[in-house]
């Protein structure tokens, strides 16, 4: 199986992407370009997919939004543009005995507006609580409108600054604004490092808040936002680099969102493999790709993976991307493994009944989306000193006469046998292959929409992490604190393995409802070399937003941060 690792050759086809392309100009003032899936080439691709899947799905015509960012130190009163957005905490909104702002910046703005800002914010009941926002059209400033956005507590987090950027983007959409600025009411207590991270989070929020996945809508509004100035957080190469970095990560997050949003009649295992190869060809100075077909997977004895894929008319594709810096010594080798079920019907244990959400099972490749999104971002960032392997065993879990049956005994690529007691516990069968083939690395992180049990335990916005390694747990949690993505470590209770024992094979593939997320992690542990640090991330909850009815791109930002922590950058 080590032969799969570190393959450096690949063949590429002129197969156009149906996903967003990004182009960046120089760091100081760069643009984020979203290429729609409606170009002539994309239409040809959509049509070729439709012939295979009878979807007949075409994408709409839309223009690509471009945002130019600049970091400036100017007087807010003098800034000229459509919307001046000010992020304010509850403390910033404190008033004196005359109901006037005590915050110096708000005082200055209010004075310039002859007291209208304090009066209008009172009428709108704006108190600076997290999630609050109001847009005011007040004469007297260089900006046409002023938007106030609540940050909550004075010790605002990465998430709060990201929400500030998203709120500014939402205000721009509402007002059809083309140029906006974002500032903080107070930067007291913010170190130089915190100012940089705040600028990065604001940029992330603005980019992702502007982006809308309208590929499958017959009509859509064109984004109007063209430029965004970040005021009062510094100028120069350091902040320019941070803003550029945030935009690069956003490119990966948006790819992750689009992959998850794409319906199964469009995003087949073959198309997912083509998207992976597109990443390798775009960043060919640091990436290589190796895509294995079914016959090659058979030669490598990937039985547990191929049995899951056996019922589908869309054949399995095993994806391996390898990132190697173009120069310098490799200090670490790590791997990212993503579950890649482009659709999961549940198989013969079909998903039925309330809450089964079979219509959303296109998101069962959310782990793969995070892994490939991270690959795209890292292709732009190009960290030094670290070799990264990206593994996705892409397939569908369907029902047919050739499909996997309850009671079947299958053999994994490491030789262990598995009695299938539930065909809807298929993700761990495919992940076992991805994990097994990466024993030549020092660290492995796998990501999967693996269990409903994890969603029950942690809710819809927190991913569960499982690892025997305290050091790896600290690394990944530290990365998540920078990215703002929420993780929570859950126990790997070895005594629960008793429920995974089979009378006729080495193990069964599910231990039942109690502790389901834990037993799933214990199953995956069977395929990890003891010398390799390994972590499993169950992102079944946060990969999808029920409120927005859209993918989140969860996992991309944390993976990129973690890879950078393992690099020599």
Swiss-Prot record:
Nucleus listed as a keyword: no
Protein name: Neutral leucine aminopeptidase, chloroplastic
Location, primary (coarse class): plastid
Active-site residues, as the UniProt record annotates them: 351, 428
Highest classification ranks of the organism: Eukaryota, Viridiplantae, Streptophyta, Embryophyta, Tracheophyta
Annotated GO MF terms: aminopeptidase activity; identical protein binding; magnesium ion binding; manganese ion binding; metalloaminopeptidase activity; peptidase activity; protein folding chaperone
Gene: LapN
Protein family: Belongs to the peptidase M17 family.
Reaction equations catalysed: Release of an N-terminal amino acid, Xaa-|-Yaa-, in which Xaa is preferably Leu, but may be other amino acids including Pro although not Arg or Lys, and Yaa may be Pro. Amino acid amides and methyl esters are also readily hydrolyzed, but rates on arylamides are exceedingly low; Release of N-terminal proline from a peptide
Biological process terms in GO annotation: cellular response to heat; peptide catabolic process; protein hexamerization; proteolysis; response to wounding
Residue range of the transit peptide in the UniProt record, numbered on this chain: 1-48
